[in-house]
Amino acid sequence: MKSGFVSIIGRTNAGKSTLINSLLEEKIALVSHKQNATRRKIKAIVMHEKNQIIFIDTPGLHESGATLNQLLVQSAIKSMGDCDVILFVASVFDSTKDYENFLSLNPQVPHIITLNKVDLTDNATLLKKLSEYAKFSQHFKAIIPYSSKKKSYKKGLLDEIVKYLDEHEYFYDPEFLSASSEKEIYRDFILESIYENLSDELPYSSEVLIHRTKDTPNLLILEANIITDTNSHKGMLIGKEGATLKRIGKDARFKISKLAQKKVLLKLFVTVKKNWQKDEEFLKKLLNDEN
């Protein structure tokens, strides 16, 4: 029996959250085509042949001077020292420059490269990309092609990860899907629905705080505040006669209900907090709040 923690590292939009959901065969991680969508570390628990692997989905590595983005990158880098294995995820279409930047961080634990999205390319392109990474072979333990859409890739990746885990009793109940709180996952589902329903820039000025939950056998009640930085953004989030907010709520309620396996009553409010992305104390509390 082995058990351990695996940090998923990579650039924004490399497909890290989609990979987690595919390994778990359940949606718990926020997925968006927009960059820097992941803000909090999600811990997904995957059981593989009596071994327990806890995957930590981290914010994407990127360069930015914004306070929020700096804290996100710091969170990702910190997770590299708090794990047993690093899974470096890169799209098969990305250059090796991101991997070189990752190596410059001097990772101290074994790492595996996962070339994602291989279902979108041909064998010749994949072989060419594998040869480009070959010059770094002294650094990584393995390089594994992967597709989140095809289950046939799953076993090979999990087998490779288990090789580098220590013998250890389970850290969590093997029936659990995640070590993250349900509230944290629901919050990300709401944020994901904002991303899906609004233009490219507005979602980045928004955050979600769930301030009330009531869970009964047949009904889950949630009340959440969507925080944004200007009155004009508040108006866009609400929409004409509340249409946009209703659409966000409908989408989020569907995702939450599917995971919770019960009816969901979701009440959304929109609050303006100017310059919240520059308030370091607020951001630290926000990013570390799992209650």
Swiss-Prot record:
Q: Which residues form the Era-type G domain?
A: 2-167
Give the protein name, as stated in the record.
Answer: GTPase Era
Q: Where is this region: G5?
A: 146-148
Q: How does it sit in the membrane?
A: Peripheral membrane protein
- Domain KH type-2: residue ranges: 186-274
Which organism is this entry from? Answer: Campylobacter jejuni subsp. jejuni serotype O:2 (strain ATCC 700819 / NCTC 11168)
Alphabetized UniProt keyword annotations? Cell inner membrane, Cell membrane, Cytoplasm, GTP-binding, Membrane, Nucleotide-binding, Ribosome biogenesis, RNA-binding, rRNA-binding
The processes (GO biological process) annotated in the record are: ribosomal small subunit assembly
Stretch list, region G3: 57-60
Asked if the record carries the keyword Membrane, the reply is yes
Q: What are the start and end residues of every segment in region (G4)? A: 116-119
Recorded GO cellular component terms are:
cytosol; plasma membrane
Q: Which PANTHER family match?
A: GTPASE ERA (PTHR42698), GTPASE ERA, MITOCHONDRIAL (PTHR42698:SF1)
Q: What is its main location?
A: cytoplasm
